[in-house]
């Protein structure tokens, strides 16, 4: 798969297969194409060459396909993107009601279940501005789970958080992984990666430079660029 922004090629010859229940962590320096890669998976960014197939559905120009895939692919960003004028509960029920046409009562039951799952059930009636950054990011995870996705994409979900709030978000992600969620996570949290990832991907200059099982990646990286990166962040 290839992608350009104008004349600049941001993704070069990406070849990746993700199996159900697999946990992949993508790392690499700033500007290496990590975020663009996962944003292409649910068509937030459009790729120019190659195929992206999610659960048997190819991501093409067909908006019906795009909508179907987006309903199956949850996404959590650096910024929480919660609606400030809606309660936490209403933030979580919005998509199931409007996209899945779920009755409000069912959507609320589902939302409360996932708010409990991310350990924030007691904040359901509050508004985003009343919550800490870590709490808001956990709400964002619950909101994505309310669409009952088959895969979750995380784009540096802790990078905008104060250090003391990072652990509460990572704990939720660890639990998700243990419960069998298929996950692709862009992060520099290498402790999390060692605990959760089945496979590590290192990207640089728009390419997958190294792809390996987690233990092998940390114990015996092959590429010099990977070795340098790990020496700087570990």
Stretch-by-stretch model annotation:
Residues 193, 226-227:
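A general structural signal for well-ordered alpha-helical segments in protein cores
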Residues 223:
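ATP phosphate-binding glycine-rich loop
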């Amino acid at each position: 798969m290839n992608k350009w922004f104008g004349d600049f090629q941001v993704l070069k010859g990406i070849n990746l297969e993700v199996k159900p229940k697999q946990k992949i962590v993508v790392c690499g320096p700033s500007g290496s194409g990590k975020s663009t890669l996962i944003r292409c998976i649910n068509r937030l960014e459009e790729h120019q060459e190659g195929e992206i197939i999610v659960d048997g559905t190819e991501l093409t120009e067909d908006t019906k396909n795009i909508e179907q895939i987006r309903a199956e692919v949850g996404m959590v960003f650096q910024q929480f993107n919660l609606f400030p004028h809606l309660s936490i509960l209403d933030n979580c029920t919005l998509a199931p009601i409007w996209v899945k046409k779920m009755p409000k009562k069912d959507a609320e039951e589902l939302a409360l279940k996932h708010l409990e799952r991310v350990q924030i059930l007691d904040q359901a009636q509050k508004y985003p501005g009343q919550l800490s950054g870590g709490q808001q990011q956990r709400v964002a995870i619950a909101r994505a789970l309310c669409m009952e996705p088959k895969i979750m994409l995380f784009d540096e979900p802790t990078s905008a958080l104060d250090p003391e709030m990072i652990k509460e978000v990572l704990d939720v992600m660890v639990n998700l992984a243990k419960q069998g969620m298929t996950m692709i996570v862009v992060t520099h949290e290498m402790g999390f990666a060692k605990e959760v990832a089945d496979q590590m991907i290192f990207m640089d200059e728009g390419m997958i430079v190294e792809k390996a099982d987690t233990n092998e990646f940390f114990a015996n990286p092959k590429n010099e660029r990977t070795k340098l990166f790990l020496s700087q962040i570990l």
